[in-house]
C-alpha cells in the first residue's frame, strides 16, 4: 500500500528534494482538490464505480475548504488540523471567475446526471437555432428541451444522458 493510499488522501505527494526518501505533504490545496473532484465526477459519468469517491471528496471540500462566513474557498488547509491557512488572499480573477465556478458547474452536472435528474443550463446565444447545438459544458448530452424568455436573448436548455 502506498503512502497516499494509507493516508486515504488524494493530494498527498512526495517532495523528492527533502530527505533521502522524501517527505509526505499532508496539506490540502484548493486547486488540487477541485480538479480531483471534477475528475472523479467526470469518471463517474462513464463508470459508476467512481461515484463512491464523491461523497467523501465533496464533504471535505464543503467542510474544510469553503469559507462559510465570507464565501469562496480557502487556498490551503493544514493537513494535520484541517484548519484554513490564512496566508494568502482567497480571491483572484482566474480562481474565482474560472476554477471556483467550474467546480460548482461540474458538481451540478455530475450530481444531476448521477441522480437521473434533468440538467438545466442557461445560454445567451444569438438564436434558438444556435442553442440547438449547445453542449453541457465539455460533456456530451441529449437536449431534452429549449425554452426562450420573450424579449430576452436567453435560452434555458435542459439536457439528459450527459456523459
Language model features with spans:
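Glycan-recognition and catalytic cores of secretory/periplasmic carbohydrate-active enzymes
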Residues: 1-163
Amino acid at each position: 500500500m502506498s503512502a497516499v493510499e494509507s493516508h486515504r488522501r488524494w493530494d498527498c505527494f512526495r517532495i523528492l528534494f527533502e530527505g533521502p526518501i522524501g517527505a509526505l505533504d499532508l496539506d490540502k490545496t484548493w486547486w488540487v482538490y477541485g480538479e480531483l473532484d471534477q475528475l472523479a465526477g467526470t469518471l463517474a459519468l462513464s463508470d459508476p464505480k467512481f461515484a463512491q469517491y464523491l461523497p467523501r471528496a465533496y464533504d471535505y471540500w464543503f467542510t474544510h475548504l469553503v469559507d462559510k462566513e465570507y464565501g469562496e474557498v480557502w487556498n490551503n488547509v493544514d493537513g494535520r488540523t484541517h484548519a484554513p491557512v490564512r496566508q494568502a488572499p482567497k480571491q483572484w480573477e482566474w480562481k474565482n471567475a474560472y476554477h471556483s465556478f467550474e467546480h460548482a458547474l461540474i458538481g451540478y452536472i455530475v450530481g444531476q446526471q448521477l441522480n437521473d435528474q434533468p440538467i438545466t443550463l442557461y445560454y445567451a446565444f444569438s438564436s434558438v437555432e444556435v442553442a440547438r447545438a449547445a453542449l453541457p459544458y465539455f460533456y456530451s448530452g441529449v437536449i431534452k428541451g429549449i425554452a426562450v424568455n420573450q424579449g430576452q436573448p436567453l435560452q434555458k436548455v435542459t439536457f439528459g444522458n450527459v456523459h
